[in-house]
């Protein structure tokens, strides 16, 4: 699926290595391969944005390598494609050799897969399913500040789905582990690929059912109920967490204004 770039190739350029992405001047490069000195390099076409190809190159530069988080305020579709590129680059890097027999792997031609010619094993990009849930209690929403967040943002509860769990079971378990609360009326809202490092966020709304709030200090710095019109600092627009909070606020406005 990789091809050697020519002077006539152009589009958006996702240049990634070890979870970092090349962002000259803080933006995803756009233009011709010649303009960005990419002629002759091998690239994968991973999608299309605004009628132009999006290319992935698995290499690094000495400067301007950054986190794909810097693109979170860009258009959602472009951020998603950049995240795809970062995840694929990491997949190619971490699957150069077969985990069963140790022989070199090669890329498939029809799909994103790494193949072992020696033992015929096939490896696909890892995707970690996660649940993220906004919990409403009358005109309040549960928000928490996570230990991993250093910028004072308050958000909703989330966690990884474990082996053998349904999404509903994962939501109930994560909520109880982090807050000691039980919920009801769980309903699916939307999903969002989240390349940190390779998650798929599945978003839900829920209503409080029972329990006294007691946050897990290993996961959360604090957690509390916030009235819908008196909220702390929130996640940025474009994140699925922000979408859930805004949906919950809208429900509160309908019922309490």
Curated annotation (Swiss-Prot):
SUPFAM superfamilies: Nudix. A divalent metal cation 2 binds at residue 174. Keywords: Hydrolase, Magnesium, Manganese, Metal-binding, NAD, Zinc. Pfam families: NUDIX (PF00293), Zn_ribbon_NUD (PF09297). It catalyses: a 5'-end NAD(+)-phospho-ribonucleoside in mRNA + H2O = a 5'-end phospho-adenosine-phospho-ribonucleoside in mRNA + beta-nicotinamide D-ribonucleotide + 2 H(+); NAD(+) + H2O = beta-nicotinamide D-ribonucleotide + AMP + 2 H(+); NADH + H2O = reduced beta-nicotinamide D-ribonucleotide + AMP + 2 H(+). Gene3D superfamilies: 3.90.79.20, Nucleoside Triphosphate Pyrophosphohydrolase (3.90.79.10). A motif (Nudix box) lies at residues 159-180. It is an enzyme of class 3 (hydrolase). Its cofactor is Mg(2+); Mn(2+); Zn(2+). GO terms for biological process: NAD catabolic process; NADH metabolic process; NADP catabolic process. Belongs to the Nudix hydrolase family. NudC subfamily. Homodimer. This is NAD-capped RNA hydrolase NudC. It comes from Edwardsiella ictaluri (strain 93-146). The gene is nudC.
